[in-house]
Amino acid sequence: MKTGALTTFLALCLPVTVFATTLRLSNEVDLLVLDGKKVSSSLLRGAESIELENGPHQLVFRVEKTIRLSGNEERLYISPPLVISFDTQLISQVNFQLPRLENEREASHFNAAPRLALLDGDAMPIPVKLDILAITSTAKVVDYEIETERYNKSAKRASLPQFATMMADDSTLLSDVSELDTVPPQSQTLTEQRLKYWFRLADPQTRHHFLQWAEKQPPS
């Protein structure tokens, strides 16, 4: 897609619906899947928040933080993938609250029994269900979207069955009229559909930065 066409395409992605919940992102949280859809890391890189509709949501993510080792050394701690489900029906803002993770002992405890909180805009805890996403694939590159679908079909603690089949058929991605102004034509690629979805969820500043980046890209 040529840069000019990409910019025009993205400009048409601005939401026509009003989102009611702001999910504040943390630089210590690597968001992998949102509501059954793989997160577009390139679009959300550096974003401070994304906008969600009211209702049930599910995040798959990893906690990534530098921890101290003995002898004043440090290493990057990466948690196992976690699944958290919650409802934003009456909530306007969601914030991550991570436990203390400063050393190997605290990291080991977190691996064995993860715990964290989601807080609303008044710093009040939001009811959540938290679980570890057990990976069944032996591939070098994990498809977290597929693993999340499998998890949601297994009636686990944080499963949300309504997100289990959303990605089973890529041709249905974003075909609901509540997510698109019009149903995408058959010629529209899956990549474009995914890009449109994540562009609409990104906060205005992230959209602006992405459009600036797109304008600088050479035509393909």
UniProtKB/Swiss-Prot annotation:
<dbReference type="Pfam" id="PF09829">
    <property type="entry name" value="DUF2057"/>
</dbReference>
<keyword id="KW-0732">Signal</keyword>
<comment type="similarity">
    <text>Belongs to the UPF0319 family.</text>
</comment>
<feature type="signal peptide">
    <location>
        <begin position="1"/>
        <end position="20"/>
    </location>
</feature>
<dbReference type="InterPro" id="IPR018635">
    <property type="entry name" value="UPF0319"/>
</dbReference>
<protein>
    <recommendedName>
        <fullName>UPF0319 protein YccT</fullName>
    </recommendedName>
</protein>
